[in-house]
């Protein structure tokens, strides 16, 4: 399999699927980096080799979100090879390879924001419900299920 022809055909495939020129350029850049990094043919890449690639990206201090994007693009490329180029291979990138992305904690309301909120609330029932949520950390569903 001639890699230059495969990448050119992959580019055509992306354009036919109406990807923007920036997306096509980005995909091809990532695929080229990946192919250069590989020391084995694409057909020989194992899940362990993908783990090594993830470690390589982590050593470059890439964020897990970016690494997951790289993996998704490589997954698309392997699917292209398998279904369009009819290359007999197993896609080494699966969902279990994706990195866990830490979610930021929600920020708390400032005192002024809380005051504005309570200025808008007119009845005692709603005030009590919002105070429970704000001061006790209850969720909307938990407050809705409360009985007296």
Predicted regions span which residues?
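Conserved catalytic core of the tyrosine transesterase superfamily
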Residues: 1-148
